[in-house]
From Swiss-Prot:
This is Large ribosomal subunit protein bL33. One of its GO terms (cellular component) is ribosome. HAMAP family: Ribosomal_bL33. SUPFAM superfamilies: Zn-binding ribosomal proteins (SSF57829). It comes from Methylacidiphilum infernorum (isolate V4). One of its GO terms (biological process) is translation. It holds the Pfam family Ribosomal_L33. Belongs to the bacterial ribosomal protein bL33 family. Signal peptide: none annotated. One of its GO terms (molecular function) is structural constituent of ribosome.
Length: 55
């Protein structure tokens, strides 16, 4: 099965002492071997931040 469940976690929230926002999704392991980084909305910081794959 080429698709894998992933978790994207905010990289800026921990440095500021806020709760980390997380997004869940899937990725195709055959097309993207590295870790995914996306800009997603963080409701705790009220702005878009960089979210990195943690799983």
């Amino acid at each position: 099965m080429p698709r894998e469940q992933i978790i994207l976690e905010c990289t800026e929230a921990k440095a500021l002492g806020k709760p980390a926002s997380r997004y869940y999704g899937t990725k195709n392991k055959k097309q993207q071997q590295g870790k995914i980084e996306l800009r997603k909305y963080n409701p705790f910081l009220r702005r878009h931040t960089l979210h990195r794959e943690i799983k």
